[in-house]
Curated annotation (Swiss-Prot):
Similarity comment: family membership: Belongs to the G-protein coupled receptor 1 family.
Location in or out of the cell: Cell membrane
Entry keyword Transport: no
Positions on the Cytoplasmic side per record topology: 50-58, 127-147, 200-217, 279-297
Paired cysteines (S-S): 21-253, 245-251
One Pfam family it belongs to: 7tm_1
Protein name: Adrenocorticotropic hormone receptor
Entry function: Hormone receptor primarily expressed in adrenal cortex that plays a key role in regulating adrenocortical function. Upon corticotropin (ACTH) binding, facilitates the release of adrenal glucocorticoids, including cortisol and corticosterone. In addition, MC2R is required for fetal and neonatal adrenal gland development. Mechanistically, activates adenylate cyclase (cAMP), the MAPK cascade as well as the cAMP-dependent protein kinase A pathway leading to steroidogenic factor 1/NR5A1-mediated transcriptional activation.
Lineage start: Eukaryota, Metazoa, Chordata, Craniata, Vertebrata
Length: 297
């Protein structure tokens, strides 16, 4: 969504005329380093699940899906930084056909990162709900075949939606659709949490007998969701302000923080793997085995 994702430069030009807020710029090198770190961390998560059979369960497949989403967000920024660098060196034209196509592909990756994160978190939330309240039927309800089918549907939808949003990014309905997915996801998970809370109160004794791992997974989801909201909400607000009030002095003050909001998104990809590792003993054991194996080579 080039006129939105990359709109800060144009908007900030008018912002200086309507607002006293200075544009907050961050060095591209910082974005690049954080993005590289995010790619490597999430790649380690994915490799750990692929190489360890004791991690090949639905919950970890959904975590892999979230890791792929985070990795796409980091790759987006890496490729964008490289494109900007070559453009500044004069190798690319500002509005050439190759540059425009490349820009569309990069923007699609960014949208895939957001959509993939949203639906992966939804899948994890539903998985945790079934784990807690249908523990005895969990393995018959959440099978590997169904997990793969759900993930295939999620990513097919995300790819189709991402391409569509980039093609029609200059239309306001597209922007509204893009931004509405974020609050809709929050409302759905909030309703799920309220239902889980009410069910927990009426089934307190049964829940207290559940394995600690089941509740640990629910707490991990809560932490992941909190980090996701904290890191993405400022950028979603940025998109709305750029679309509906780009010349308002108060809006332009917030829009001037574009780089800070972008930095938060990059940080999300770095923070999530630490949450997985800190909350999951199985992943920590897998990491130790991978490190021991690499030392033996």
């Amino acid at each position: 969504m080039k006129h939105i994702i990359h709109a800060s430069g144009n908007v900030n030009g008018t912002a200086r005329n309507n607002s006293d807020c200075p544009h907050v710029a961050l060095p591209e090198e910082i974005f690049f380093i954080i993005s590289i770190t995010g790619v490597l961390e999430n790649l380690i998560i994915i490799l750990a699940v692929i190489k360890n059979k004791n991690l090949q369960f639905p919950m970890y497949f959904f975590i892999c899906s979230l890791a792929i989403s985070d990795m796409l967000g980091s790759l987006y920024k890496i490729l964008e930084s490289i494109l900007i660098m070559f453009r500044n060196m004069g190798y690319f034209k500002p509005h050439g056909s190759f540059e425009t196509t490349t820009d569309d592909i990069i923007d699609t990756m960014f949208i895939l990162s957001l959509l993939g994160s949203i639906f992966s978190l939804l899948a994890i939330a539903v998985d945790r709900y079934i784990t807690i309240f249908h523990a005895l039927q969990y393995h018959s309800i959440v099978t590997m075949h169904r997990t793969i089918a759900v993930l295939s549907i999620i990513w097919t939808f995300c790819i189709g939606s991402g391409i569509t949003m980039v093609l029609f990014s200059h239309h306001v309905p597209t922007v509204l659709t893009f931004t509405s997915l974020f609050p809709l996801m929050l409302v759905f998970i909030l309703c799920l949490y309220v239902h889980m809370f009410l069910m927990a109160r009426s089934h307190a004794r049964n829940i207290s007998t559940l394995p600690r791992g089941n509740m640990r997974g629910a707490i991990t989801l809560t932490i992941l969701l909190g980090v996701f909201i904290f890191c993405w909400a400022p950028f979603i607000l940025h998109i709305l302000l750029v679309t509906f009030c780009p010349n308002n002095p108060y809006c332009t003050c917030y829009i001037s923080l574009f780089h800070v909001n972008g930095m938060l998104i990059m940080c999300n990809a770095v923070i999530d793997p630490f949450i997985y590792a800190f909350r999951s003993p199985e992943l920590r054991s897998a990491f130790r085995r991978m490190i021991s194996y690499s030392k033996c080579l």
